[in-house]
């Protein structure tokens, strides 16, 4: 199992019995995530990919955890061009999925209304890599901040809480 984290501060132990875990730090953003995950998939040939990370929200609470099956690329969704994939689902690959991730290459700090339960910068890219390579993908997000409420500072302050929350 390849387990992805955007930054070193998000890395936690993932104790899955009888599983060989390969943790990778992808870097922030869709391009870094897609590159790092593709390289890891080609080298490791995993049975599945688990993305663990932090995210913001507009409608839930700090400390909530979401298992996500629906992914939106907020940057590509603005283009509305034929052949562009800006939304995908991975529910056929998961058990008991719920949650929508809205992914883009910006740290959202204003209260612009965005579709989704959680807002991040990597999950769509990783879901797309896995879907195209036919690898089961699970994304688990810990809410660290409420968009529009000093989001960047809140995210920085809550990183350690996210690690503790996942480990519980």
Which functions belong to the PLM regions below?
Residues 1-2:
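Extreme N-terminal starter segment of soluble prokaryotic enzymes
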């Amino acid at each position: 199992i390849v387990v992805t984290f955007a930054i070193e501060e998000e890395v936690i132990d993932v104790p899955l019995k009888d599983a060989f875990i390969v943790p990778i730090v992808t870097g922030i953003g869709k391009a870094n995530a897609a590159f790092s995950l593709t390289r890891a998939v080609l080298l490791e040939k995993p049975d599945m990919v688990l993305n663990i990370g932090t995210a913001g929200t507009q409608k839930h609470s700090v400390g909530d955890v979401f298992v996500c099956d629906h992914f939106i690329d907020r940057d590509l969704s603005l283009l509305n061009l034929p052949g562009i994939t800006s939304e995908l689902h991975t529910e056929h690959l998961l058990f008991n999925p719920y949650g929508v991730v809205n992914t883009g290459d910006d740290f959202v700090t204003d209260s612009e209304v965005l579709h989704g339960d959680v807002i991040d910068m990597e999950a769509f890219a990783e879901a797309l890599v896995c879907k195209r390579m036919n690898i089961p993908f699970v994304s688990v997000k810990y809410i660290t901040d409420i968009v529009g409420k000093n989001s960047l500072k809140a995210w920085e302050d809550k990183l350690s809480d996210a690690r503790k929350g996942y480990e519980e």
